[in-house]
């Protein structure tokens, strides 16, 4: 494992080891206190552009499930089609995993998706820093590379456009008792799944959809939100 350093905007440095894809990245450093669910969290579009810190001490011990689609086109075990977080930061990564539904390790999945992972970080101390000073930008640098990489800025990237669908997608078409227009600004698949379980027809449209020529009447309107800093 290569040495890697997480550098925060306030100058704080946290040293660890790499277990994912090896590339320098930058983004907003945030934390997640869930004990399980890293496949769902990593594929959640609301984490786009962020370095995700997991406070639970042991991560990876139940591996990663297969990527499969339900008949309606939704991911069975994940919240979207791919990882959206820029990186994952953990205290203790387990390469060995055991779960009836696991097909690969977290590290192998990260490498395949080209997402960095850091282990050996005091994630609870890092969380204290973020809790006391607020989330801040940070960057990941490897031991043999310059840590003077450009700082990330949300103003440079339209994350809503990145995570939104590119065309209209219909679910339960013609069969739902109610019709919902869902504006996709970074929707989790489980939100759509919950609507479908309630016998709702969902019309999922891109964030910049042109409503002037709309050819249907919806009973409700939902707009999903992805986190953006101006």
Residue ranges and their predicted role:
Residues 216-230:
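Cysteine-nucleophile active-site neighborhood
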Residues 1-212, 225-227:
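RNA-binding accessory domains that recognize and position tRNA/RNA substrates
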